[in-house]
Amino acid sequence: MNNARLLWCHSGVVNVCLGEQTFTLVAGDLLYAPEGAFWSDTGSGLILELRFRILGIDGPARRIHLGRAWAERMVHEYSRSLFGEDAVSGDVAKLFADRVPTPPLPAPRHARAVAQTLAANPADQTSLEEFAAQRGVSARTLQRQFLSSTGYSFSEWRAAQRVCVATSLLAHDFSIAVVANLVGFSATSSLTRAFRRHIGTTPSAFTTGGIGMGVAGTPAAIPSRTTFAAATRDQQLWIYTGTATVTTPGYCRFLTQGDMATIPAGTHTRIDVAAGSIAIPVPIGVGEQGMSLQEVATLRDQEPSTGLMLVEESRWVHLGRELLPATAPVSL
């Protein structure tokens, strides 16, 4: 089973450690943590951990900035993960597929050490000859190691690395002139030429066109959804936003934002959530007053499993013959 996950920074600023890597996330950042990566965080922000059996994302850990416009869309995705959905939504997985790739690290040790230095400080202006002298090899040898191992010459690799870092900075609303300086280009025109060569567009078009790690565009609307579930232990359902209807044998309740409904163990439950609405399962015994995403995330850290098992609709008809017809939810 894949234990890779997505970490959504819903608010504040959080430092997330993945092994030897540290990522500083701000509200609107989404981080991919690959399989086998253990994570911890410090800071005052709120991280929502999205666990799916199927992510459709691979490669190293990486961060993209979606912005606050994606906040409710990602809370919806968090809700899907808590309900036990198998796979992350395709549009979310595609965000990582579209990103500007980091140039590969060279395998030979001298070139690899140089590449790691440049990755840590893209603005480093050390020349190929100076790096070669530091490593005790010829400039020709170092150049050959870059070309044979990555397909890039030394200068091309450095430019590709700078462009990759620049896309992340542009996504965090730094100006093009500031970004050019931060990643080591002498002028914005140099950054523009590198952008055209490596990703086929200009920095200004990148920040307005929804390409890769730039602006992610407008998220898809949250659809209505019907979930058929069997509760293995007592559970509650909290309406984060919008409306929903919970139907169990002999019982039907219409819920609005902030409401909480109890789903007893052994109950077969139909949950109809209106378009634009989000319902989140929470452990039993938590009151409606003061419920928040922060509280949900804390509780789920302590008790990851919700105790809800999804049931196929065809099997549901057999399990819950006595269900009342569900009242159609009304969008707010």
UniProtKB/Swiss-Prot annotation:
Keywords: DNA-binding, Repressor, Transcription, Transcription regulation. SMART domains: HTH_ARAC (SM00342). One of its GO terms (molecular function) is DNA-binding transcription factor activity. Gene3D superfamilies: Homeodomain-like (1.10.10.60). It comes from Corynebacterium efficiens (strain DSM 44549 / YS-314 / AJ 12310 / JCM 11189 / NBRC 100395). This is HTH-type transcriptional regulator RipA. It comes from the Bacteria. The keyword Repressor applies. The keyword Mitochondrion does not apply. GO terms for biological process: regulation of DNA-templated transcription. Residues 112-209 form the HTH araC/xylS-type domain. It holds the Pfam family HTH_18. Induction: Repressed by DtxR under iron excess. Under iron limitation, represses the acn (aconitase), catA (catechol 1,2 dioxygenase), leuCD (isopropylmalate dehydratase), narKGHJI (nitrite/nitrate transporter and nitrate reductase), sdhCAB (succinate dehydrogenase), pta (phosphotransacetylase) and katA (catalase) genes. Residues 129-150, 176-199 bind DNA.
